[in-house]
Structures are given as structure tokens and as C-alpha cells.
Amino acid sequence: MTKQTEYKRKPEWLKIKLNTNENYTGLKKMMRSKQLHTVCEEAKCPNIHECWAVRKTATFMILGAICTRACRFCAVKTGLPTELDLQEPERVADSVVQMGLKHVVITAVARDDLKDGGAAVFAETVRAVRRKNPFTSIEVLPSDMGGVEENLRILMDAKPDILNHNIETVRRLSDRVRARAKYDRSLEFLRRAKEMQPDIPTKSSIMVGLGETREDLLEAMDDLRANNVDILTLGQYLQPSKKHLPVIRYYTPAEFAELKEIALSKGFSHCEAGPLVRSSYHADEQVRSAKENTVEAK
């Protein structure tokens, strides 16, 4: 079997059953009516049917649908972004009410065209959701916002329940995989977030199957723990289109189980690992587990 056929032919464990019941259809209509975007759709997440139809959860993507970066793994559109929509925070908050969410994830495209990287709108979205949904836990998943400390502080001052920022891949592959992002800058971003708000759990995610070695993965885990990251998610990279980076290898469920055990042994309070795991997959369970472990640690 050639490397090309290896990454084009998905193994059985990556095949999913689509479920488009009334919850899924209703949520899709609501998102369009409120002119909102979800990373579930834009990034072609394989779990969209489970989350929307079964769990009735979604990850909102704010600051528009066009990213200023062109990472070679990502399906989100790139180009010249639209103007900021200052009413977007309230629409997101209203949607959380309508959906009855207990946990919401708010992510965004990278906005390198903005001085604050979109931090002010991000923070206002957190506050709007909190005002209208006081019992909903809030997870934020920002870009590195240019690595500017003040931008991160604006977001952390809004006090989300969890700060998620993905390193995406291992150090050796980072420059090839992540356009305009830096491995060490992401680690610093995570470290600073914990320093600013020590009681807020931090989280990061790694895709596998891009050509990394076992040693690369162990090093990345150690790097995250050295910067006090609490939660790790590990999932299989899937090629969105022929224009994106190819899959070099598919990891088996058994390999993911082993990586999870290794991550937990290194001190992560929670690790979600599996072929279809994505950063926001079962996010409600992750934040609950992290908080329980934080209480036990105290």
C-alpha cells in the first residue's frame, strides 16, 4: 500500500452514522436566522451530527467567517475579513438561551487585521452570555491574538470558565502546519493565561497523523504541562480537501487509549483522546472534570 492510498482510504473506525433529526435541522435554521457561524460547520467537524442532533450543543464562531491566516490543515475560509458586527455578542447570548445550553464554547477566526485581535468583542460575548445565562459555563477558544499580552488580559478579565488555545501539532511540524502562528508563542499564551487567572482551567489540543513521531508527541505533552495546561485533547487529523496537508497515518483506537494514559500520567487533569475527538468534543464533560480535579487538588 502506498502512502497516498493509505491516507485516502479511511479505516472503519472513522466511519460515522449521520443523524439529522429535528434538533439538528432546527439548530441549523436558527444559526442562519441569527446570522451566526459555528466552527462545527465551517471547519467540517465530523462530530456535528452527534453534537447538534443528540447532545444539542454547538461551538459558536465569532468575528466573522473569514480568517486572516491560512493554516494548511484548516477548512475555514481565508481572505479579507468583514467589518466587526458589534451586535454579534447579544445574538450569541440569545441563541444560548434558545438552545438551553449548560456549556457553550466560543471560538473565533484569527483577526490579525485588528489591533486587539478581536479581544474586546470576544470579552463582550462572554459577558453577554453570562448576563443572560448565569448558570451556563463558558469556554473560550481564541487564536494567539498576535501574542500581545494586553489582548489576552482583556479576554481573561471577562473570566470565562475555561481558556482553550490549541498548539495543534508538535514543535517539529508547527511552522509547516500553522500559518503565522508560533509554537512557543502559543505556549507562552497558555502560560500567561494561567498566571492571570490561576483558578481558570487551561486546555489545548493536538492533531495526530501529520507525520509526528511518538517522541514528538511526548515532548509536546511535556511542553504543555511545563506551562501549566490542565486539559489535553488528542484527535486524528482528517484532510478537508486535496489542497490541504495529507494524512500521513491513521492512529488506531488502541493507540489513542495509550496516549490518553500517558497524558494522564504526566499530570493532565483530563484527557479526551480518540479518532474523532476535536477540541470542543464533549467540552461540557471536560470542564466539569477539570473543576472536580481542581477541588480535589486543593
Swiss-Prot record:
Keyword Lyase: no
Pathway recorded for this protein: Protein modification; protein lipoylation via endogenous pathway; protein N(6)-(lipoyl)lysine from octanoyl-[acyl-carrier-protein]
Residues that bind [4Fe-4S] cluster 1: 40, 45, 51, 280
Any coiled-coil regions, as ranges: none
Cofactor binding mode and count: Binds 2 [4Fe-4S] clusters per subunit. One cluster is coordinated with 3 cysteines and an exchangeable S-adenosyl-L-methionine.
UniProt keywords, alphabetically: 4Fe-4S, Cytoplasm, Iron, Iron-sulfur, Metal-binding, S-adenosyl-L-methionine, Transferase
Gene Ontology CC entries for this record: cytoplasm
PANTHER family: LIPOYL SYNTHASE, LIPOYL SYNTHASE, MITOCHONDRIAL
Protein name: Lipoyl synthase
Gene assigned in the entry: lipA
